[in-house]
């Protein structure tokens, strides 16, 4: 009898939790469908990560794009990542670069770092060490350790700038 009682209580709590979750998702979808950029971004994240919904990269791309087209810096970055890695979309380095650039211009540290990489290695864009240096500096000055390390390499190798061992050491120490 005692087991039956606790099983009944568990079922009630579980069904309330499912009901609340479904209600939450329904509200987010409603806001996203009405054009609210933050709701679109959050719904996309849920689909991308399989949080409270089944993971679905196609739906994630759809909602990231809706939000990104409204200027959401985080959605622009995530859309760039999807094209960079081929998550739910074909790998397209030029499309990834486009979205990273939009996000970087708005101050995304990760997007700035990715632009530094793209320009350094000529991925999705023509190789340009000067622009690589610019974007690494932007990201490194905000504390991105990968950008700091790569900035060190540009100074050490004398790419886009004069060879400067003291600057190389400075950024090497920051990037460790």
Protein language model regions, located:
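Bacterial N-terminal signal peptides
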Residues: 7-15
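N-terminal segments that cap or nucleate solenoid repeat domains
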Residues: 20-51, 66
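Canonical positions in the second alpha-helix
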Residues: 31, 66-67, 102-103, 138-139, ...
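Hydrophobic face of amphipathic alpha-helices that form TPR/SEL1-like repeat modules
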Residues: 42-49, 53, 77-85, 89, ...
């Amino acid at each position: 009898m005692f087991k039956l009682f606790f099983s009944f209580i568990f079922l009630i709590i579980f069904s309330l939790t499912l009901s609340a979750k479904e209600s939450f998702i329904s509200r987010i979808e409603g806001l996203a469908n009405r054009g609210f950029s933050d709701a679109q971004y959050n719904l996309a994240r849920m689909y991308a990560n399989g949080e409270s919904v089944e993971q679905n990269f196609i739906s994630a791309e759809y909602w990231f794009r809706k939000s990104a087209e409204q200027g959401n810096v985080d959605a622009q970055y995530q859309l760039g990542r999807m094209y960079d890695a081929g998550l739910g979309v074909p790998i397209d380095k030029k499309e990834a670069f486009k979205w990273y650039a939009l996000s970087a211009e708005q101050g995304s540290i990760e997007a700035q770092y990715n632009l530094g990489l793209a320009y350094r290695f000529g991925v999705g864009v023509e190789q340009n060490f000067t622009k690589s240096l610019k974007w690494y500096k932007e990201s490194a000055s905000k504390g991105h350790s990968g950008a700091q390390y790569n900035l060190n390499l540009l100074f050490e190798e004398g790419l886009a700038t004069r060879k400067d061992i003291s600057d190389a050491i400075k950024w090497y120490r920051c990037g460790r």
